[in-house]
Each structure stands twice: as structure tokens, then as C-alpha cells.
């Protein structure tokens, strides 16, 4: 038994320094709270044990949202990327996504340096084995060396280290990601505290030596020449010119045959793996089985940095035995002679069932305890970082006895992510997709600052200087819109010829420039050229104006739906409501309400298995005063009449049966 001793006191303690933990700790420190960030290994701060990239569909928007709120991930990747690309440029603005290839070592070093130089923030290497909980309130942590750190709030971001187990074929051993020390006792402690945990699984592909790849047999995927950034504070002049390409190749029938012949040795199919894996990031053996009609699968060869020869074999995740992995790799065009530097592996780990959380990411059964990241059942660095930021903000607010901060589904993809977790839970590693957002035309990559910077400034995460620039941008957008409304695009041969060149019908009369801009494929630059007028604002301002005008009708429809959502969100459900008292609820709805404890009628509406009739009954019960009547009887120890008891399921007065309300 290790003897404990009282160490330092903090306002907030963050356990785990992955992408969630870094954002949580930085947010807390920037909000003026004395913060301790504890990690199993200092060499794993903001480490990328899987794909060396940031962004992509939905995920890239999350990174922009983190930056708009005052988080660090966007700045960190802008300082350490080796390639930047905008995806889905041929599609509408709702699904465009920025993706950066990271130098994973520089990313880690830059984030660690940021943390080490942030006031109010202490970084320490230790393994947390136990929480200090008194009267249902978390008051600190105890490490494996016996140090007891006291705090007003605690954030857990254990990632895949929580009782982690690595699996490579028949080989299994206790480990965190990338062969790091796992966290065992903390999971056991959480179970003793009453938390429901479950096992998830994720995996990573082999890494090969870039010097042994025959790139002539692959297709080059270069970065964008047009400057792109995740952070709104990054400048075009700093955009990286000397980018490193990724490369694309494919599996083939030979690859698939090797996999099929060895499925009996695949842990996924042999029964060794018990945890549930990610549906949207399956292993290559899973893809070969599930999509047997496909004769090839895409593979991306992604450099892991400027100073390493390691290349990540993307979309080739596997837990096959090492000897089989070698055969699989060598069957792929361009990789016939590739040297494998690290084998792929699967890792099983513990997650907290996320329905045990509030939207602030505070746990429901222990106050001042927050969880974030893969620990909550998500997959991906970006989802983790977004949760970490919200958990860190709320831990800091909780430490000051201030009300919590939440984002709605209409505010941000981060809000969609957290609401899905808290309201629906998840039976598999959760990945954020654009299709999960009902209001994705409003939750765009380009307007995250317009949606969230106000919040970041109010929370103290956005400086006054940055906020002033944000206000200037908003004014520039207004000025550009006004100028477009003032300018007239007159009938002319140049205008008609231009319309013909883009496949548009000719004009019959002159129109205002903002009306002309509504036509497909018309840009503000075209209006400036055709009219000789200058529209104020930089390219980011003009992008906002173009999207706002072109999609005005669709945006208005989404805003109407959001207004209805807000009305439902305003209808709060009392925290101590007893669903057994509500007559007429379906059994499934009653059980779901009791398990999830929705905070508003809007959240109740989103719970799977709940039908409109159940919602109507719940709404009437709350709004017609029946809830308050029930609470009155409880408070005054009154017994209702037998009629009232029969109708609303209360205990009647046995002596008189008289009405007492």
C-alpha cells in the first residue's frame, strides 16, 4: 500500500494530456484558474498515435470552432503542417472541409511548448489512480506515487490508455497507445464510484520506410497553392509554400486473397477482440469481408513529418499477425519492397457511457467531475479537442461557482457532438459527420468565427485585440453587402457574353449587383470586373457575402427551424422530476427519460425510442402545473384525494380521500 501525502492545491486538475486534455487545461488556465495538467508521459503531450492529420469533413469545422472560441488546435496545426488541402471544393459550402497533414513530432513539441509557457498552468508526469470524492463532490486526485492533489474541479481525458490492451494477431498485452503505460486503477476506481463503463476498440495501420516506396506506381496528392488556415489569426503571408505531397494507391485481389486466407488469425474474427470498433474507420480485413464485391480499396501514403522516413499507410488499419501484415503490404502497388517500421495494431480501452453526462460534460452523479475525449466514446483528435475545450471551460466556471456553458445543435458541430453523446449515447466509437447536423448550412467551415467568437470573448478566451478585429470584419461584411445593393449591373455585351460563358440565361434588364450575385457561378470578382466598381473587404469577407447572398433562402429556412428548436430548448424539465408519476407514458419512454434525464423538452424529443405522444404527455405534465402540484404534496406531506391519486398515480389519503389541492 502506497502512503499518500498532501501535495499542492489547484482550482482545476486535468488528467491526460492528449488533444482533449491540452484544450481543457489551456482553457482553464486562460480563464484565470490555477491548473494542473497530469500526463502518464511528457513525451505523449498532444501526440498523434494514429493518423498524422487534422481536419476533414465535419472535423475541420470543429477545429475552426475551437479556434473561434479561443482554443489552441487550429493555431498548433497552422504552425506545424506539411500539407494543407480544402476538400469537397466542387460541392456546396456546407460540406467543404479543410484538412492538414501534420508533422506529428513538431505538433507535439509545439503544443508542449505552448503549455509550458502558459501562465497558471503546471505540467506534470504522473499516473492518476484514484479520485478524491467527498459527499458526491470530486475534490482532487491521488497518483500512483501517493501524491494527493486537491482541486475544485477535475477533468478526466484518459483516451485509449484506460485499461488499454494492444492486439497484434495472437499477441495481446496491456498497453496504452503506441506502447505507452496504460491507466488501470483509475478505471477500477470509476467503477467503484458507480460509473458504467464499456469496451471500445480502435486500430492503426503499419508505418513503412518512405525510402523503400516506389512512388512511380502511385498517384500524387499535392497541397493547395491558395493559402488556407485553421486559425482565424493565421496570415496568408505565412502560408507554407514548400509542402510535402501525399500519395495514393490501391489494394488488389492479391491483397484481398491474403486477408481471406488468414481470417482465422484475424483477432476481429477469431474472438480475441471483444471491444466494438468504429463503423466509419474499419480495418482493412473488415472492409474486405463487408465489401466482398469491391476489387480494390483506396490507400493513402501519408508522411509523418519532415525529419522522419516513417509513412502512415492510411485506410489500411489492421490487427493481423505481423507476418501477414508484411504480405499484405507487399501486395500493394508501390509497396512491393517497402520496409515495415512499425506493425499495425488494434487497441481496446474503457469508455464512460456518455449518457451519464450533462451537456457541460460534468458527470451527473459526481459534481465538479468532468470527462472529455475518447473516454466519452468518440473517435478522432478533433472530436476530443472540442470536448476538451468545453469541459475545461466548464471546469473553470465550476471552480468559480459560475453557471455552466453549453453549445446547442444550432451553434456548432461541437454542440451536435455533445448532444448526440449525452442524449443518445453511443454503441460504437462516435465519429462526427456532416449528416449528423440538421443545420449544416449554418454550421459552416467559413463562419465559425461569426458564430462563436462572441462566446469566446465573454469567457475570457478571446483577447480584446482579437475581438476588435472580429468586429471590424463584421462591419466589413455589412459594408460589402450595402455596396452590392447600391451597384447596378447594366445590360451590356460584356455582361451577356459572360452569362453565356457560364451557362446562364441572358439578362433582360439591369439589376442590382446583389441580385446578380444570386446566379450560380457568379463571383464578386466578376461583378467588379463587369462594373468597374470595387467591393470593400478581403477574400474572407467576400466569401461570407457571396455565401450569405447565394444561399439566403435556404439559410432563412434553417433559421426558422432553429427558432422552433430554441422554443423547445427553453422548456426546461425539472431536475428532480419523477417519471413514475406521469400517467400515460410508454414504458420505453419512461425508462429512457429516467436513464438519460433530459434537461429540456427539445433534448427529450431527440431521444431514440420516444414518440410524439410521449413528448406531448411530458409537455402537458410540466406546463399545466401538474409537476408543481406533485411537489406541493411532497413538500407539505399531504395526501391527495383518491380521484387525483388514481388519475396521476399518487398515494391517496387513506382516512378521508378528500381533495387537498
UniProtKB/Swiss-Prot annotation:
Q: Does the keyword Cell membrane apply?
A: no
> Which SMART domains does this entry report, sorted A to Z?
GIDA_assoc_3
Keyword field = Cytoplasm, FAD, Flavoprotein, NAD, tRNA processing
Q: Which cofactor does it need?
A: FAD
Q: How does it assemble?
A: Homodimer. Heterotetramer of two MnmE and two MnmG subunits.
Membership in a protein family: Belongs to the MnmG family.
- Please give the function described in this protein's UniProt entry: NAD-binding protein involved in the addition of a carboxymethylaminomethyl (cmnm) group at the wobble position (U34) of certain tRNAs, forming tRNA-cmnm(5)s(2)U34.
For this entry, the protein name equals: tRNA uridine 5-carboxymethylaminomethyl modification enzyme MnmG
Q: Which gene encodes it?
A: mnmG
